[in-house]
Amino acid sequence: MITMKHVILVGDGMADYPLDELDGKTPLQVADKPNMDQLAGMGACGLLRTVPEGMEAGSDVANLSIMGYDPRRYYTGRGPLEAASIGVELGDDDVAFRCNLINADERIVDFNAGHIETAEASSLIDALNHELETRGRFYAGVSYRNLFVIEGRGYTSVRVEPPHDIVGESVAAHLPSGSEEADHIRELMLESAGVLRSHEVNLKRESMGKRPATMIWLWGQGLRPSMEPFSERYGIRGATITAVDLIKGLGVYAGLENIHVPGATGYLDTDYRAKGRYAAGALEEYDFLYVHVEAPDEAGHAGDAEEKIRAIENIDRFVLGRLLDALSDHEHRIAVLPDHPTPIEIRTHVPDPVPCILAGDGVDADQVKSYDEFTVREGSLGTWEAHRLMEIMMDPAARLRQ
């Protein structure tokens, strides 16, 4: 039996708003992306709502939705997803927090400690475990993205804003308060500064002109989610290709294997060629691939339009181009979309619907001939909830017509 191949390619934060510096166009409109444009001309286009009304426009919510799980039912928080990605098993009452290493004085300077190296971050996490008296434990992740786990369901109600949403704002104004659990988290965040500022890793970074990690920021907490495995839903094997712990963790709970790609960093310097090569090769073993590229989101957070354009072009050439070549030997369906916009001008996520292409066997072309935030509005898909995308992707009998 011939098995259809299914691919979802996510350019994280790829969508944007028109920019004066681009003569009123978006990075997607300006980028040279022949593969995306050709695919748009061959398939059906529209807008997907990846973030349900009233929920935060996080990559956790948005990618959960794209994978086919309605966040209103399945989402518990970002922390447990990242715990799964690094093999940390949570008990029923364990609450997992995302633990950013950040640079701050009285204000938050950045949310990533100058994109600290993973080995440096690991040393700092060891020091936090050794020096801070806490009922929980810190776990090293990748670069500034780390984890803190503590027992007690009351910690789920602590409100802390994501640090990437409050860069430039007062630290004190955004520390949690109002409950015993919130006070404990606030104390940990403040006490971390005393541990980190004099650490040899930070002293060395400062001597090299790099930003030190001056404190931790705990946020995005939640309990372990309960999700129906992908194989039980659709009866096929799937895998993720991503350098971001959050997406790996989503895959773990969904029963998707993660394919490690050497040189994939989750940043602007990621090896696009390697991601494309490994994705193409994985089609020989897996019938579903979720390929995620973080770079456009990082460019959006940095407010760098040229870097976002470059990231889009690299995804198009080295990832999508390679995938389309490999898929030509198979019956297939492929979707290309961002998880959410990360507009250059505001440097954070917004919940706006995202432009989507769905192409392949059983999908009739509409009149859209290029791919961006505006052309897709004329497409045959219209606007719909992103968690329904998988229903169409995985139903071999489904046929999308104009």
Swiss-Prot record:
InterPro entries xrefs: Alkaline_phosphatase_core_sf (IPR017850), ApgAM_prokaryotes (IPR023665), Metalloenzyme (IPR006124), Pglycerate_mutase_ApgM (IPR004456)
Reaction it catalyzes: (2R)-2-phosphoglycerate = (2R)-3-phosphoglycerate
One GO process term, biological-process aspect: glycolytic process
Molecular function in Gene Ontology: metal ion binding; phosphoglycerate mutase activity
UniProt enzyme class: isomerase
Protein EC: 5.4.2.12
Keyword field: Glycolysis, Isomerase
Transmembrane parts of this sequence: none
Taxonomy, superkingdom: Archaea
Pathway: Carbohydrate degradation; glycolysis; pyruvate from D-glyceraldehyde 3-phosphate: step 3/5
Protein family per UniProt: Belongs to the BPG-independent phosphoglycerate mutase family. A-PGAM subfamily.
Classification via HAMAP family: ApgM_A
Function, as annotated: Catalyzes the interconversion of 2-phosphoglycerate and 3-phosphoglycerate.
Record NCBIfam families: apgM, hyp_Hser_kinase, PRK04200.1
Protein's name in the database: 2,3-bisphosphoglycerate-independent phosphoglycerate mutase 2
Organism name: Methanothermobacter thermautotrophicus (strain ATCC 29096 / DSM 1053 / JCM 10044 / NBRC 100330 / Delta H)
Gene: apgM2
